[in-house]
Each structure stands twice: as C-alpha cells, then as structure tokens.
Amino acid sequence: MSAVIKHSEERLMKVLLAPVISEKATFVAEKNEQVVFLVMPDATKLEIKAAVELLFKVQVESVQVANRQGKQKRSGRFNGRRNHTRRAFVCLKPGQEINFTEEAK
C-alpha cells in the first residue's frame, strides 16, 4: 500500500541548495556512485529524491541524510558558531550519472 505524494514544484526547486564538491564527496562519488548535496534543514528524503529526479532527469535509488553541527569559532574574545548544515547522499540507479563539470547547454 504505497501512497503517491505530490510535492509542489516550487518547493522542490528550493530543497537542493548546492552540490558538495570536496575530497570526501569525490571519494564517495567514485566508490559508491553517490552524489552529495547541501539541502534545506527541513527537507525530507522523499522531497530530496523528487527534487534530484526533477532537476537532473535521473533515477534515484536511495537517499541518506546527515545533519552536521556547526563548528565553534572564536574571533578575539567573542565566541561564535558556524551554521548547522544538512547533507544528502543520493545514490543513483546503475547507469545514471550527474556531471557538474560539463557545460550547460
């Protein structure tokens, strides 16, 4: 008994904030065929899956989400903290690929 959930296209366009291009994200992409995105703090796995499929025209197999706490930083005598972030590790189905380095056409 699976229910089809409709997400508004406007909401889906706002869910993905940016792709994560780092050494760890590149390693994960090569080894596990996953892509890493920064997402909105209140985004659900189903919204992330729908947003990736809508924006990049690929099929998503699964989504894992990690909440990352912001680091404590100090400037002089003032303490501060960087923002908390939420990352989505999106596993694509075999044969699917998202390439951020090629030019948009």
Curated annotation (Swiss-Prot):
Q: Does the keyword Plastid apply?
A: no
The alphabetized UniProt keywords are: Ribonucleoprotein, Ribosomal protein, RNA-binding, rRNA-binding
In terms of Gene3D superfamilies, this protein maps to: 3.30.70.330
One Pfam family matching this protein: Ribosomal_L23
Q: Which domain of life is it from?
A: Bacteria
An example of a Gene Ontology cellular component annotation for this protein is: ribosome
Which InterPro entries does this UniProt record tie to the protein? Nucleotide-bd_a/b_plait_sf, Ribosomal_uL23-like, Ribosomal_uL23/eL15/eS24_sf
Indicate the family of this protein: Belongs to the universal ribosomal protein uL23 family.
UniProt cross-references to HAMAP family, sorted A to Z = Ribosomal_uL23_B (MF_01369_B)
Subunit structure of this entry? Part of the 50S ribosomal subunit. Contacts protein L29, and trigger factor when it is bound to the ribosome.
Q: What does this protein do?
A: One of the early assembly proteins it binds 23S rRNA. One of the proteins that surrounds the polypeptide exit tunnel on the outside of the ribosome. Forms the main docking site for trigger factor binding to the ribosome.
What name does this protein carry? Answer: Large ribosomal subunit protein uL23
Q: Which organism is it from?
A: Herminiimonas arsenicoxydans
Which lineage is the organism of this entry classified under, starting from the top rank? Bacteria, Pseudomonadati, Pseudomonadota, Betaproteobacteria, Burkholderiales
